[in-house]
């Protein structure tokens, strides 16, 4: 389907005069002027002039849809800050050279209280006042895709802590002043409050009898519980996992969800829940003593699930198959799952993370896959950059061999973690060329190529919390 430029502007609710231009700051108000304008300012006449502007040759201007930023530089020798109503833009003041940075760590950013002191005096913020078991509001420090080096995102949960930004690899050359741009975005992080799996249609023919028994509880309620107990059938050809096989009961509905019962610090062996006309099949992995999972199935296994019709965040396959479950964790581990991949020394390979997540109640939910935290993950491999993991789709990862020897990427190798957050979008913004998209006053493109609608983010002024008064 083809789109004309006029219809595209109407769909984006942009007038002819709202094409991107050059920003100007006059008396604290940001205006944008076109290079060859035909825009008519409200309340002003359009006379012939240089460049189609007024009689004095000036370009026509329009008011920005966002308030003017407040420049802030709280005595920091390395960074300058532009404070907007819904986010903060950070740029480097000085020239960075490879020798001045240690361990791929940039100079620390001051805390949010000092950054926002010019516009919001005595600003205080903690996620404990803006969150719960399902979600929390936090500041996400992310990079601009135009930066010459890649940096990992950082979650800021308190306004009194300094902000550390780590590079994914050392600088290879000097970066001039203004060459690095980061954003501090107040977003809603969505946390997994349980292991929810989507019940899939089993397309494989199973020529075996049932391998386990079923017990039930609360069967007449809206959330019945089913417990599977027995011996797993051996793995079949084609690299499939061993599985538990039980008779299908009326409580199992295709397209529904199930909450797998998990224990703190223990790896859940269930990889998926598949439903056929007569059977329920649960592919499982073997539990090892170190909390990981293997290829063979355990001799005896017991699994409990709670059947639900809706879920805040659910997966097609269990992302915790190789990591112990942690209730307090706000991110999801990312492990490679697939055939072995040979990666030469110092080279990279592109692999597809085939898991899919569902969020039927959160239309604007998205995820970003970032490299592992310090001391976590496999040091042999590393991600070359962050990427978006869209809802209902797969993610393509560039995995680099960081050693001097040939390495083999195998199932279970830790690659990173996923951060889930609410990302308000601009309709059809990806149809615009990159140079137009970057100049939209409300568009902010961040890590993973995610373009956000800055006007729909949390307002910083509304997140401020009053400090408790101290008594003598």
UniProtKB/Swiss-Prot annotation:
The gene is 11. Residues 1-21, 63-74 have a biased composition (Low complexity). It comes from Equine herpesvirus 2 (strain 86/87). Pfam families: Herpes_ORF11. Residues 1-74 are annotated as: Disordered. This is Uncharacterized gene 11 protein.
